[in-house]
């Protein structure tokens, strides 16, 4: 049995399309420290994308997995948790029934992340990469959805979400794999149709690189002969094109055998490459850059790290005067305490005040002539750990 730890211990459970994962975390000197990690395969995505529903037997399996995780949470002395579900649960026609069963059987409240929220969490992590440029295309490629966003002048300038992903594509084309030429032709047509909206919205904009996060990127980088740069995996466009051309002559069974991949990964590798290939084509980007991004650790940070710390880090990244921002924050906290009998505002509002103090100079580099408006625009479109949309707007205002 694991020993209970000193300090706050939290857990994050992720009910995904292929696996049910749980991590146990604690705040450490370098940020979030993972104490334990569990992963059990469960093919929710295959079931939902094929039938539209989650079967009763699968709900039982899921409930059993979560009971085991609850025991681990108890052993570690977890005091706060967050349980999320993504694309498969989001698209299940009977998701309300499934969530209700988990609440009754497991006493667990599961939050279904919508497309935009899932993408925003990933973008917040991608924006911390040292490989981010002044103007970059950010992307999140999931099992059933793809998110894209343009990062410009310290904020997300344009974003869109597509209801397509590599697992969903794989399920849609199941049965075509043996007809190799037809399979790839239909695959490319599907991907091109879904990305038409992206091409129209980008309106000819080009980028030198795409910063992205997604499943199996380590497998793709290894297959394509990618390299590591500043902690990120980098795949050149030429490498990806060469690998895609090689795969076009193989079916999934041959790919698994020749590339020494599992059958599951071999099934999904062609849709993955087709999506990345289309993104590179639309943007004329020369490379894919995949910094280490972990959605569960991002959510754990929300539970463990104070929002004002995240705001301070964001201000530093934007080039604000950190010492000045800290002085403004200190004065704000002092005045808040002295005037508490008059204003009667709660402690949560103090956190928002600290965030506003730390971020008030955020717009200086973006627009010297109208710093206030620039700061407002940057903050309202940002994601700050620990704050919801309404609280972020209050900070911006």
Would you name each region that the model predicts?
Residues 80-81:
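Post-signal peptide N-terminal segment of secreted/secretory-pathway proteins
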Residues 7-10, 24, 47-76, 89-98, ...:
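Helical "lid/coupling" subdomains associated with nucleotide-phosphate turnover
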């Amino acid at each position: 049995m694991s020993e209970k730890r000193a300090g706050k211990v939290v857990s994050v459970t992720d009910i995904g399309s292929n696996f049910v994962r749980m991590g146990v975390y604690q705040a450490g000197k370098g940020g979030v420290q993972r104490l334990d990690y569990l992963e059990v395969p469960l093919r929710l995505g295959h079931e939902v994308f094929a039938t539209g529903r989650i079967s009763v037997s699968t709900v039982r399996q899921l409930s059993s997995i979560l009971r085991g995780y609850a025991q681990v949470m108890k052993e570690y002395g977890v005091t706060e948790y967050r349980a999320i579900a993504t694309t498969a649960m989001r698209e299940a026609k009977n998701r309300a029934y499934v969530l209700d069963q988990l609440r009754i059987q497991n006493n667990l409240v599961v939050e279904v992340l919508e497309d935009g929220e899932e993408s925003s969490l990933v973008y917040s992590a991608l924006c911390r990469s040292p490989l981010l440029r002044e103007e970059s295309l950010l992307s999140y490629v999931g099992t059933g959805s793809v998110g894209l966003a343009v990062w410009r002048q310290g904020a997300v300038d344009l974003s869109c979400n597509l209801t397509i992903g590599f697992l969903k594509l794989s399920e849609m084309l199941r049965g075509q794999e043996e007809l190799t030429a037809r399979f790839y032709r239909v695959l490319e047509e599907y991907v091109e149709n879904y990305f038409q909206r992206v091409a129209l919205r980008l309106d000819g904009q080009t980028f030198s690189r795409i910063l992205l996060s997604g499943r199996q990127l380590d497998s793709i980088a290894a297959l394509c002969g990618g390299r590591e740069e500043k902690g990120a995996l980098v795949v050149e466009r030429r490498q990806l094109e060469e690998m895609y051309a090689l795969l076009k002559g193989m079916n999934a069974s041959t790919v698994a055998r020749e590339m020494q991949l599992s059958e599951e990964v071999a099934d999904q590798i062609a849709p993955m490459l087709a999506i990345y290939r289309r993104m590179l084509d639309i943007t004329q980007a020369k490379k894919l850059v995949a910094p280490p991004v972990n959605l569960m650790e991002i959510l754990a940070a929300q539970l463990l790290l104070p929002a004002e710390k995240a705001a301070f880090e964001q201000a530093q990244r934007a080039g604000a005067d950190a010492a000045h921002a800290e002085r403004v924050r200190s004065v704000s906290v002092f005045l808040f305490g002295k005037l508490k009998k008059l204003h009667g505002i709660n402690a949560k509002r103090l956190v928002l005040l600290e965030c506003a103090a730390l971020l008030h100079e955020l717009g200086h580099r973006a627009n010297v002539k109208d710093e206030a408006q620039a700061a407002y625009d940057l903050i309202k479109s940002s994601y700050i750990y620990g704050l919801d949309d309404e609280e972020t707007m209050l900070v911006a205002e």
